[in-house]
UniProtKB/Swiss-Prot annotation:
<dbReference type="GO" id="GO:0009002">
    <property type="term" value="F:serine-type D-Ala-D-Ala carboxypeptidase activity"/>
</dbReference>
<keyword id="KW-0934">Plastid</keyword>
<dbReference type="InterPro" id="IPR050515">
    <property type="entry name" value="Bact_Transpept/Beta-Lactamase"/>
</dbReference>
<dbReference type="GO" id="GO:0006508">
    <property type="term" value="P:proteolysis"/>
</dbReference>
<keyword id="KW-0133">Cell shape</keyword>
<keyword id="KW-0573">Peptidoglycan synthesis</keyword>
<keyword id="KW-0121">Carboxypeptidase</keyword>
<keyword id="KW-0812">Transmembrane</keyword>
<dbReference type="Pfam" id="PF03717">
    <property type="entry name" value="PBP_dimer"/>
</dbReference>
<keyword id="KW-0150">Chloroplast</keyword>
<dbReference type="InterPro" id="IPR036138">
    <property type="entry name" value="PBP_dimer_sf"/>
</dbReference>
<dbReference type="GO" id="GO:0031969">
    <property type="term" value="C:chloroplast membrane"/>
</dbReference>
<dbReference type="Pfam" id="PF00905">
    <property type="entry name" value="Transpeptidase"/>
</dbReference>
<dbReference type="GO" id="GO:0008360">
    <property type="term" value="P:regulation of cell shape"/>
</dbReference>
<dbReference type="GO" id="GO:0008658">
    <property type="term" value="F:penicillin binding"/>
</dbReference>
<comment type="similarity">
    <text>Belongs to the transpeptidase family.</text>
</comment>
<keyword id="KW-0645">Protease</keyword>
Amino acid sequence: MNKKKIFGFSRIVLVWILFFSGSSLLLGRLFYLQVMKGSWLTNKAKNQQTIILNTFQPRRTICDRNGIPLAIDTLAYDIFAHPLHFKKSTFDIANELYSILNLDVEYLQNLFIKNTTGICIAHQAPEQIANQIIAKNIEGIELVQHPKRYYPYKQLCADVIGYVNTLHEGQAGLELSCQESLQLQSPEVVSAIDGRGFLINDGIPRELFKQDSLCLQLTIDLDLQKASYLAIYDGIKKCNAKRGTVIILDPYTGAILALVTAPSYDPNVYYDFPIERFKNWPVIDLYEPGSTFKPINMAIALEAKAIKKNDFFYDEGCIQISDTIITNNNYYNKQFACDKNSHLNITDVLSNSSNVGMVHILQRLAPEIYYQWIQKLGLGNNVFLETDFPLSSYSSLKNILEFTSYNIESAVTSFGQGLAMTPIKLAQLYACLSNGGNIIRPYIVDGLFDIQNEKLFTLNNNIFDQNISLKRKLLKTKVFSPSTTEIVLDMLEEVIFNGTGSSCFLPGYRIGGKTGTSQKHAEQGGYSTKHILTSFAAIFPINNPQYVILSVIDEPSIPLSFGSNTAGPVVRSIIESLIRIKKIPPSIPTLTHHYYCK
């Protein structure tokens, strides 16, 4: 009896042990699954029961100031052949495709024979070609659709707009600097799916079909861009130059109306061009402006009361500063004679582009005062000109100790050597002369506009901010008084009418401008005796400035190249186009004029 009780009790204990052991294991497993692996299992279940839907979002269109598209998204097709699945002979297939793809029949046949599948016979084919192939319904031919950025004006706007790579990411120009504003973010929508992977009931969510019709509108005027490109392309061809650029600026707002370089590149096929073409050098590369900086120096001397409007200076033809002899227009012959020009008033100094006269004028300013004025203009090693482009524009100037310790530094700076800046910076300084003495910030992006051409956002540090004012705040600094700039503008008109800028004279129209010819630095140090930069800066019309036009030509190679006979004709051609495009009437009676170049 006792044995039976003990045996029964043992069985009860065993059952309880097994029960508690099983319960413990079950609770442990539940704890492991619910607590330790809970997040992982939840995500796994979510991934099995839902799907994240998104669609490709195109880049916003870039257009000029009049809404003309300059960069748009289109569809393109990669065309693949799979001979393994052909129902016809390779010869027949090649005959059907050759005329559409503009490829040789024999070439296509060889491709089909060498491989059995996955042959790319066309890359980024346009939609009209794809439609022709689809219409033929050829088995074994596959079309893979993908977005493509299309630039309808090719080289014309490449330096401004830039290009995108195969991943649709901006690599240069505004495509790069405005990447975040141009590339729309694709919305992610979570939707439930069944066991077969099909959407449950609701179908495709409406959020995926939201469209953005906004356009990134520039200040560029396509008509002026065309005229500028044709003029500079013809200009560098005639003088056999390395490269050239043209900038047209609104002197009151800072809006860039045209910016071109030649030679340029086609952003549709950017990979066919040398990489140095992708650099927007008018905004990045430094050069010594030469005589085009003389009007700026004249304004400094007038504003600082160092000279007066009716002052005269003696131009002895050459002047020695320390160990250096400075002459007038001495770029090709070191033995250039010191021709005496007698006494010149300040207008004659500018009109004749007298280096010696400019040295005498700036000698009336103490070097440290002169240096401070140059810094006021936004020039210096640590001063940057911010633009809408990817890289900042900067300048180069000797440090104040070197500038004030050596007389030669202020002397060569008086005629535009010894300091360096970008073409866009020089255009900004001429805008300052044009608008009454204000330094304004050049810009090229106007804002985001809708299909009714109404501005919605203004660009703020290359990102569109809905909270800031739609009216662009002009960033300007007062440097010169209107009375000073008025005197300089009159002098610039005389340069065109009866001076070195006479190649830009147009009967009936009042134009102001200045030629420039500067030596480039030699690799071994000092200045080159062979390589120069020529330039021409113009203000039109001079009595009511609306346009600042700058042309710079790098390394012209015709005999006796100067700004007057290389860059001058480029600017003249652009002004003629401006008159035609904008229907600008003459402002003075027609005058006869005899051209000459200095």
